[in-house]
Amino acid sequence: MNGPPRQIVIVGRDAALWLSATVLRQALRPAGVSVAAVELPSRLSMSSAYASLPPLEALHAKLGLDESALLRSTGGSFSLGTNVVGPADAAPFFLAHGSYGAPIDGTSFFPYWVKARHFGLGAVLEDFCPTAMAARQGRMLLPDEATEAFGRTDYSYHLPALAYVAALKVRASRLGIAVHHARSVTVELESDEISAIALEDGTRIAGELFVDASGADAVLIGQALGEGREDWRPAFVADRILTAHATPFASVPAYAETRVGDTGWLTLHASQAATHITCAFASDLQDDETALAAAQTLSGLKLLDPVLTPIEPGCRGRPWSANCVAIGSAACAFDPLFDVDLHAIQLGIVHLLSLFPVSGEFAAERAEYNRITRSAFERVRDFQSAFYALNRFGAAKFWDAARAAASPAEVAHKIATFRARGDIAPMEDESFAPDLWQALFVGLGGVPESWPPAIDRTPPERMKEEFRRILGFVRDKVLEQPAHDAYLRSLCRSEAA
């Protein structure tokens, strides 16, 4: 190949396939790049839902996906973060898609809060977060100039998966993507690279760059190219996941809720269409039938259409191998905690676009892509691992094993730095903001032993004044916000009209 790739062939299923196809086609069509999508059988069920992180909103905007139309067609909802509910002796805490506090005298808020807590402040960290407080009061938080000046006020989505994929397919059709359907494919190799994909009916689809979006099957990068995988299972206890759905809540909360049980955890994702349930557990501690009964008890809901599947966290040594780029779980499979799968798909696509080859020789782009994506995936893994390592959820066997699991060295370093002075050790390619890490550590019972001495220059009365100002801003701003249900109804109704 003399010039840059002009023919991209994507083999896969579900969101990984259709997000890859639509984003690459939309971005590269002006350069004359064609995209062919080979769709394998879906692995989704009626119970499946995609929970996003905030960056997906911007990706949708670039694709020309109208937010109100998407939420109406999918029956989706907004999410302002995750409420974590532990045992009775552990206070719930909120991981918000927004800032905790605002800077004081040019310094981040958190060390002032730590100092104040040492001197008896009763207000918890989330009291200073408009996003968390809006969610707890059943409201949506709409960004404006005041909230932008305060800090981040982001949101994400809960999207019923089958309907979301259908919406992406409509967009793909409008972009002129060539679509083929196959139950299985044969991968043709030439000089250790992929040259074409052969379908069961004899159709042969040649390409210059191939994308593996086939999920855990890793049809191209794993089965055909033999690219190895680093096993992350030693850091995670759960090896089975149960997904199910229940009837929608009468009032749809603007957040996910993770509930901790003795044998694992369960997350509820509320949408307009249904309540989607994800439950993670360890098969050596609980069989499938017992897990289903436990999930029903912990959720308090009648679970419909349960599906049980294995989970094997791990990452490809090289997500881009030869002329094949793996996207989604073909590249990296995560523990299901905090619903990062859709975000991982987006990370892979965005970095591929930023490093798309400019010539037929793309070894440099490939090496940089592998460095960046591996680093980004590891930072996401670290956030999940920290939840398990620091859990204070009692002496149940699952949580004992989680605390004893082999956490990555980066997690231990972050924990040690936080405990010493409340700081979050900065690392490249983070997906989660420092104050979200701090909220996680505080929520799990972490209390820094001290704070940076530079903040001692701020007089106590000045600190108190700023705390009162921030709490007043949060209270007033939240009271201005519409109820989440009402906002969803108005948004979807205006689109229908």
Predicted features along the sequence, with ranges:
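Conserved FAD/dinucleotide-binding core of flavoprotein oxidoreductases
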Residues: 261-312, 332-344, 355-358, 362
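N-terminal Rossmann-fold NAD(P) dinucleotide-binding loop
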Residues: 17
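Long, low-complexity C-terminal extensions of enzymes
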Residues: 358-497
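Conserved mid-domain beta->alpha element of the FAD-binding
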Residues: 314-379
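Glycine-rich FAD pyrophosphate-binding loop
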Residues: 25-48
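Predominantly flavin-linked oxidoreductase catalytic cores and closely associated redox partners
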Residues: 147-291, 349
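Dinucleotide-binding Rossmann-like beta1-alpha1 core, especially the glycine-rich loop
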Residues: 44-134
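Beta1/beta-strand and adjacent pyrophosphate-binding region of the FAD-binding site
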Residues: 3-14
